[in-house]
């Protein structure tokens, strides 16, 4: 994705070989990720941004409450309505070689080089996430209350996901038909 042109206001703090820039950025959430049958976002969202320059590395922290964003999904646990706050943090440790750590109360995701990493919905897979190799593909962990097979396997999206390494699902109620 691309960061659109922004009108920036904020502050600059310089101390001991470190430069910290603080500002706000506005994003059209629909432009950040391609919509799929499983996930889409819509809304104009403001992020508090901190750019940190230290030891020749530029990192970026973004924080928002996603109040102006609607998240649609075939998975009920991932959906979010407009005007519902969901504090979300995004951290990019090195803008010259970006990886993305995204965290909120609903999910946690790490997207590394070549789109390797993980997506975890719910909090029941912390141990398994610590044991995976983030460089060998993309791992999906889903903790769901109720699950219909049709919700996830309704088309060939996963056949086209060449780096999908594993999918682990914990389900309270499974509806096969």
Tell what function each PLM region has.
Residues 1-105, 111-177:
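Membrane-proximal interfacial segments on either side of biological membranes
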